[in-house]
């Protein structure tokens, strides 16, 4: 009986000793697997976020740039090159001007969003599904059926600028007066102006002039 008890005690001691030796190894393996899994998840999430940001840039900036190009330079070919969902319904000059106004309203909204992102970029990056939501937002702004850009411009941007127009003009006047009194600023502006004067100059007619009419014929 005593021999059996001694064997059980010895076996238990061996198990405990083995556990003590193996536990750190198992803990290390588990930590390595956990860290590896976290890195894979972070890499996958980062790759997905990068892809969504790229798609957001294509929709939010790439397409409007191309659309602006078509409306300014190729009015006769826009119906062939624009997707059907974004085509003008008729070829009247009034419709072209309305489409240009909607596009200018879009660029105003886009500028506001870009300015907000430059300030709140670090915080917005932590918002779940931010890139996906931004894609939906761009589509809502651009779609001629929803006319989201025109709505935001008329409802928020235009009233805000109208209410603060005097303050903005006053600030700009003071800024000009301040900068014109600073020799360093004047010298810097003279340098910038000299560099601008050295850039190539084109001889083109303004968008919306007779050149558009000639191209559309």
Curated annotation (Swiss-Prot):
One of its GO terms (cellular component) is phagophore. The keyword Transcription does not apply. It is found in: Endoplasmic reticulum membrane. It is a multi-pass membrane protein. The chain crosses the membrane at residues 9-29, 54-74, 103-125, 135-157. GO terms for biological process: autophagy; endoplasmic reticulum membrane organization; endoplasmic reticulum tubular network membrane organization; macroautophagy; nucleophagy; positive regulation of autophagosome assembly; reticulophagy. Signal peptide: none annotated. This is Uncharacterized membrane protein C30D10.09c. It comes from Schizosaccharomyces pombe (strain 972 / ATCC 24843). The lineage of its organism: Eukaryota, Fungi, Dikarya, Ascomycota, Taphrinomycotina.
